[in-house]
């Protein structure tokens, strides 16, 4: 994945730019809040919580159904298969799946779903099963970036278009898949570094709780963080890096080891909220107080943003999981023969002590 200065240049023609604008409006207006699910009234904050597309600039690549080799189809008559990668204990995955299901229901589209339960071999067989059950279109939230050849070959044989969300498949756009919809993970890492620099004063030792190996999210969030620290705060030293596998339990275990081996640590960059919340639990268990160690995380879950309100977390960089409207908007346009961007970049917000309490309703 390229950096922001390149990745925001996604759309080249006025029609495609108009499509991106429509996607942004649709994604925002279709966002669901927890109050909606309970039948309550949607808050203003929740109404603003939908995904917004980064303003497009000239220079990006697009895809059409003719170039891809698929067939035109009315989305309302299609069967869409959705493959979720991870156990839905993580609020990000819960919100992501709910968004896909809500949008399919809103549009009256038949949806088949499968959850790989964090097992890559199962995700491959899940998608193959979705194809066997008659999926005309696929939306995939990949667990890993590599190893997708069996699925790509099977989908190509049936001329089934694929849209990937959140994590990238290492394959060729407009040949193996249509579009990739995600945040700019390098930029998320940079913004996390900015918040860490502000919180620590740009001096001292910090640790990184890495996400799981084998996907672009971990690689790029790490890259962005380190680049920004090197650029703006050479006095801030990364002295510890270990994977927490994007889970709260592992994040807690790694942090317990960290504070034993590096008692002078000043900050922890957790590459998702769940690991960050695990770090908070470890600090509480060790008798630390809020603010003793600065924690910066990425995602925007309600528990993490509450952690900012409570003083345990210094900042949260949002990674919005509400992909449903954008994914279906892309599929709808594509199956009608319109050009769609090969990369659709989401514009994320952030939570700090200045806005966390006010914007808590936007969290998921």
In which residue ranges do the predicted regions lie?
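Short beta-strand elements at the ligand-binding edges of bilobed clamshell
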Residues: 113-115, 171-195, 208-210, 241, ...
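Extracytoplasmic "Venus flytrap"
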Residues: 48-103, 107, 112-125, 142-145, ...
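Flexible loop/hinge segments that line or gate small-molecule binding clefts
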Residues: 46, 146-187, 205, 301-309, ...
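Bacterial lipoprotein signal-peptidase II cleavage site
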Residues: 27-42
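Short, solvent-exposed amphipathic alpha-helices that sit
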Residues: 91-106, 188-192, 216-236, 250, ...
